[in-house]
Amino acid sequence: MPLHNLTRFPRLEFIGAPTPLEYLPRFSDYLGREIFIKRDDVTPMAMGGNKLRKLEFLAADALREGADTLITAGAIQSNHVRQTAAVAAKLGLHCVALLENPIGTTAENYLTNGNRLLLDLFNTQIEMCDALTDPNAQLEELATRVEAQGFRPYVIPVGGSNALGALGYVESALEIAQQCEGAVNISSVVVASGSAGTHAGLAVGLEHLLPESELIGVTVSRSVADQLPKVVNLQQAIAKELELTASAEILLWDDYFAPGYGVPNDEGMEAVKLLARFEGILLDPVYTGKAMAGLIDGISQKRFKDEGPILFIHTGGAPALFAYHPHV
């Protein structure tokens, strides 16, 4: 795989050493299957998470363009917005965040705690909207207003999920392959599939590095019919950037996100509690809890291609636990 093409893209080193890839002995015994976990929840900044991999590329591009302001969008409890705001603070940039309330709650805890609390600590300028119905257009409109105020904005899409940001997860696939070499033959990889950049980047990288491993994206907000084109389009855009072929089938499970994005469900919360009690690792109610619910049920329903070891990609999100009390 010509990963040397990755070096063509400016990148800031926020993460440093590879994040741990760990065996989960007690959880494995409970499920009757070897379960490993990639700990992207412990990336260095702002309580960790997967978006920092994307921001290494996106923030480097922003600096290259001479930007002094990062603009992005998400839910009030967005992990991506939190990490973008932290990166802006570290780089001495202004950050403007366009936020929506996707679950329509008036609960004070959701509106002020968790990720939202951290945005204030990072001195983020908050702009509220009724809904992110067309986030790309809404971000461009916000950037125009910010530019009129004399700033030099750089727009980062929802989730940092464009071809440039998703290169962070092609890089992650290389890291995973190196960590598994001579240690474990991973049969299946499970990841939450939302804004699609993490899923698509892994799809491109793992196709070339661990071609015998199946990659399952557990959707957190959309049906397979709606999510599939998002992942495929990004997969092909990444491959074009890297001058690679990308022909791996995109596999999605959409049985675990109901009743909707950002709304906890019983299966997801049970997964959060199980991993906390067996391994002392914190998942979240929005992304990783639902993805882990898919992994657990997938074993029970024999949905995986075989009974080999499974790798769970922990994308972070624990700060949201505080916002979702008393559901937790």
From Swiss-Prot:
One Gene Ontology MF term: D-cysteine desulfhydrase activity
Family matches, as Pfam families: PALP (PF00291)
Superkingdom: Bacteria
Catalytic activity, reaction form: D-cysteine + H2O = hydrogen sulfide + pyruvate + NH4(+) + H(+)
Reported cofactor(s): pyridoxal 5'-phosphate
Residues with PTM N6-(pyridoxal phosphate)lysine: K51
EC number: 4.4.1.15
Ranges in a coiled coil: none
Keyword list, A-Z: Lyase, Pyridoxal phosphate
Signal peptide segment: none
GO annotation (BP), single: D-amino acid metabolic process
InterPro entries: ACCD_DCysDesulf (IPR027278), D-Cys_desShydrase (IPR005966), D_Cys_desulphydr_bac (IPR023702), TrpB-like_PALP (IPR001926), TrpB-like_PALP_sf (IPR036052)
Assembly, per entry: Homodimer.
Role description: Catalyzes the alpha,beta-elimination reaction of D-cysteine and of several D-cysteine derivatives. It could be a defense mechanism against D-cysteine.
Similarity comment text for this entry: Belongs to the ACC deaminase/D-cysteine desulfhydrase family.
HAMAP family in alphabetical order: D_Cys_desulfhydr
Protein name: D-cysteine desulfhydrase
Natural source organism: Escherichia coli O9:H4 (strain HS)
Organism ancestry: Bacteria, Pseudomonadati, Pseudomonadota, Gammaproteobacteria, Enterobacterales
The encoding gene: dcyD
